[in-house]
Every structure is written in structure tokens, then in C-alpha cells.
């Protein structure tokens, strides 16, 4: 079966023990690795966690495929590597970028990757690397990332992600997650595409605990969608690229690696529509901590300290009384990389536009720009809806080092600090 343009089917849920077969009876019954698998398939295990993890944390999927993944020649290091591979020195300065220009030459998803910042090389199970992607051509090769799990945030253009377990179609205002090591191909449905990626080197992403919020709210498990089995039975030559410790390596296959006919497990790719996020906010006063906007989190061994949080700032009502309503001025232990999918961000009146990005490192002071601050202080505090917007944040506990390419791109705004320069002192000790 080819991965064509027909409508895609999905399975609903987060962390489920899913199962799917593209041919009836392709899944073995009652065991994982029979002496002879149905249809002459090979059984293969893809482990997303160590064997001895607690059952509640374990992730693995059994694949029943036409050709074992082990059948490949040696990988060779590619001459063309990911842009932004070289990290610059850490900087405490606040950074902001205009949208990166779309490529003029034919560029697929892999060639269009630019690493913006990172805090880990990928050789340890911790940290994150952050990328933007810019593409104008569908991939004719396949890819897998041995360094981490990929969280894709499209900003421009729809993507079809053809994975070993089936296909996902994602558009701006949706996200997709591809497990570490899973092979996939990116097809462009609109000719051009731009977006953001968090490469999670740590524990797999999961839903945050809700605490006193209760048993419902934020991103609900039923709204996450996993693919159903679809396979390619092709004997045409194809390049398979892997990312290993930050570098791209490739080999030539004599078949498609997207040849899984059936599978079962919980280590799966999935998508989520950000418009389904159940936003929580104040109905009295003050601005709650932005952790109430967490969609997914990768925890560390320290309870409550995230390796990475994926946070969104969606459309919502602002009703707080006697309150400075924008996100407050802040100095944060965590490191914040922000992007904007559409609309405007309520703490920035200008300069932060869809496709752009910003980086505020540990203890770098930030907050509303002068214009947003003045408007908020003078605002008539009627109920107000922030609409047609979607900003997001990758927040991580380790300091992010920007790449040299990110600091040298013309998209870097050299005057970012100026947005706070016109903040004036209004202090008057004689008047409360």
C-alpha cells in the first residue's frame, strides 16, 4: 500500500497500548515473537525506554515488517550537515529573531533545518536542542533521530509525516511528536513550510500532572491522535539518514523502511490540535503562573523540575479585576525559547511576529514592552478576549547556548533591548 493522499484514520488517546494492522491477521495473537510471523513478516522491537523502567514509564512498540531494520550497509557521514551545528558561547543577553526567510533553492525538511540553540550534545539522556525548519520540497529519503524525540510545531504549511507506524497530517495550530529512532519522511502539502522543533534528549514527553485542577483540563488525553498501520512495499533504492550525536549519517537501502504492516505498543508518533486545549485562568485577580498553560512535559529526576515544558498561550478571556493583565515582569530560573504561530502575543505590541522567535536565558529580565505596559496600566478592565493568537514556549531547566548561525543570521534583531528602553519611573513617594 502506498502512502497516498487519501484521508487518514487515527487512534485516540495518550500513552495507550495501541495496536493496528494493515492486513487482517497480521498481528500475532497471544505473543510478540512467534517462530513464523503472519504473512512472512519479521518481528522487531523498538524500545523508547530501558527494559527495567517502571511499567508506568516504559515505552516500547513491536513492529511486524517486511524487511528487518538490521538489513542495511554501513552508514557514512554526510558532507552536508545541519546548519547551526556549532554552538556559540552562552550569553545572558536577550535575543529575538524575525521570521527566517524561506529558501529559494529546492530544500527538503532535512536540508532546511537550522539549530537555534541547545543545552546538551545528545550523548546523555537530558537536555534539549531547538531548531527551525524551512522547506519547499518534499523528502525523497527517510530519516530517524537517534539523539532524541522530536516535537514539531508547524507555523506555515501543512505536513504529512509518513512514519513506520502510519501517517500523520499536521497543520499550523497542531503539533506532532516523533519518538526517538522512528523512521519517517516529511511531505509538504502546500509547497512551502516553516516551523519549530524541540529535540528532547531527556525522558519522553508526557502530560503534566493536574494537581488541584482535578481530573480534567489542559490537554485532554482523548484529543491526542496516533496513526493506523500503513506500509510501503517498495524495492526502489532509497537513502536512509540518521542523526547520531549531532551529525548526519546515511546509507542506501534497496527497499522502503516504512514497511511495517502491523504493530502494537505505546511508543508511537502522535498529533494534537492546540485549539482543543482547555485553558485555565483566573476568574478573580492576578495573573497565574504560565505553568497552567503546559501541554506536555519531559521531567527530570527532581520532582517538579522539567527537562523541557511545552507551553502555549492560546485564545482566552481576560477577566481579572484590579490586575495588570499581561504576563508580568520576570526573572526566571528556567530558560525560555518562544515562538509565535499566528496573531500577536499580549506582552509584545510589536517586533514579535508569526515565524519569529526569542530567547530569554536564566535570570535574564524580561516582560511586557513599554507600549504593552502603558496600555495595560491605563486599560478599562472589562472582560476582554485575546483572540486569533497562538504563542508557545519551550522552557528548559538547563541554560541554552545559541548557535553561531542563529547569532549571525540577518533575522537577529540587534535592537531588541530597545523595546524596554522607554519604560520610565513613575514612582512618587508622596502619592500612593
Swiss-Prot record:
Homogentisate binds at residues 345, 366. Keywords: Dioxygenase, Iron, Metal-binding, Oxidoreductase, Phenylalanine catabolism, Tyrosine catabolism. Its cofactor is Fe cation. Pathway: Amino-acid degradation; L-phenylalanine degradation; acetoacetate and fumarate from L-phenylalanine: step 4/6. InterPro entries: HgmA_C, HgmA_N, Homogentis_dOase, Homogentis_dOase_bac, RmlC-like_jellyroll, RmlC_Cupin_sf. Pfam families: HgmA_C (PF04209), HgmA_N (PF20510). GO terms for biological process: L-phenylalanine catabolic process; tyrosine catabolic process. Its EC number is 1.13.11.5. SUPFAM superfamilies: RmlC-like cupins. It catalyses: homogentisate + O2 = 4-maleylacetoacetate + H(+). GO terms for cellular component: cytoplasm. The active site is at 287 (proton acceptor). Signal peptide: none annotated. Fe cation binds at residues 330, 336, 366. GO terms for molecular function: homogentisate 1,2-dioxygenase activity; iron ion binding. Involved in the catabolism of homogentisate (2,5-dihydroxyphenylacetate or 2,5-OH-PhAc), a central intermediate in the degradation of phenylalanine and tyrosine. Catalyzes the oxidative ring cleavage of the aromatic ring of homogentisate to yield maleylacetoacetate. Belongs to the homogentisate dioxygenase family. HAMAP family: Homogentis_dioxygen. Hexamer; dimer of trimers. This is Homogentisate 1,2-dioxygenase. It comes from Pseudomonas aeruginosa (strain UCBPP-PA14). The gene is hmgA.
Amino acid at each position: 500500500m502506498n502512502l497516498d493522499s487519501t484521508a487518514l484514520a487515527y487512534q485516540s488517546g495518550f500513552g495507550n497500548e495501541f495496536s493496528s494492522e494493515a492486513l487482517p491477521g497480521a498481528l500475532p495473537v497471544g505473543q510478540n515473537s512467534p517462530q513464523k510471523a503472519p504473512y512472512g513478516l519479521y518481528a522487531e522491537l523498538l524500545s523508547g525506554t530501558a527494559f527495567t523502567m517502571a511499567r508506568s514509564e516504559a515505552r516500547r512498540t513491536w513492529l511486524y515488517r517486511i524487511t528487518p531494520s538490521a538489513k542495511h550497509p554501513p552508514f557514512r557521514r554526510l558532507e552536508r550537515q545541519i546548519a547551526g551545528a556549532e554552538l556559540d558561547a552562552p550569553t545572558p543577553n536577550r535575543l529575538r529573531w524575525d521570521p527566517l526567510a524561506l529558501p529559494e533553492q529546492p530544500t527538503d525538511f532535512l536540508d532546511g533545518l537550522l539549530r537555534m540553540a541547545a543545552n546538551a550534545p545528545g550523548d546523555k539522556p537530558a537536555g534539549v536542542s531547538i531548531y527551525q525548519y524551512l522547506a519547499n520540497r518534499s523528502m525523497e529519503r527517510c530519516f530517524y533521530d537517534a539523539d532524541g524525540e522530536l516535537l514539531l510545531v508547524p507555523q506555515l504549511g501543512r505536513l504529512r509525516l509518513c512514519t513506520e507506524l502510519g501517517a500523520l497530517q499536521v497543520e499550523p495550530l497542531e503539533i506532532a511528536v516523533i519518538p526517538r529512532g522512528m523512521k519517517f519522511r516529511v511531505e509538504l502539502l502546500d509547497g512551502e513550510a516553516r516551523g519549530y522543533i524541540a529535540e528532547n534528549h531527556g525522558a519522553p514527553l508526557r502530560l503534566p500532572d493536574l494537581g488541584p485542577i482535578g481530573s480534567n483540563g489542559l490537554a485532554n488525553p482523548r484529543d491526542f491522535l496516533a496513526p493506523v498501520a500503513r506500509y510501503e512495499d517498495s524495492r526502489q533504492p532509497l537513502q536512509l539518514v540518521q542523526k547520531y550525536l549531532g551529525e548526519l549519517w546515511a546509507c542506501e537501502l534497496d527497499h522502503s523502511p516504512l514497511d511495517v504492516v502491523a504493530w502494537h505498543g505505546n511508543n508511537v508518533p502522535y498529533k494534537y490540535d492546540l485549539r482543543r486545549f482547555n485553558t485555565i485562568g483566573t476568574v478573580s485577580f492576578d495573573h497565574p503562573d504560565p505553568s497552567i498553560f503546559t501541554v506536555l512535559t519531559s521531567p527530570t529526576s527532581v520532582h517538579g523540575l522539567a527537562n523541557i515544558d511545552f507551553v502555549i498561550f492560546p485564545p482566552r478571556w481576560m477577566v481579572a479585576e484590579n490586575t495588570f493583565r499581561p504576563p508580568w515582569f520576570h526573572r526566571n530560573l528556567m530558560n525560555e525559547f518562544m515562538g509565535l504561530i499566528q496573531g500577536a502575543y499580549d506582552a509584545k505590541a510589536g517586533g514579535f511576529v508569526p515565524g519569529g522567535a526569542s530567547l530569554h536565558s536564566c535570570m535574564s529580565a524580561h516582560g511586557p514592552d513599554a507600549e504593552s505596559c502603558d496600555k495595560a496600566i491605563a486599560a478599562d478592565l472589562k472582560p476582554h478576549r485575546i483572540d486569533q493568537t497562538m504563542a508557545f514556549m519551550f522552557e528548559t531547566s538547563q541554560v541554552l547556548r545559541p548557535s553561531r548561525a542563529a547569532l549571525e543570521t540577518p533575522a537577529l534583531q540587534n535592537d531588541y533591548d530597545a523595546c524596554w528602553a522607554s519604560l520610565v519611573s513613575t514612582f512618587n513617594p508622596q502619592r500612593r
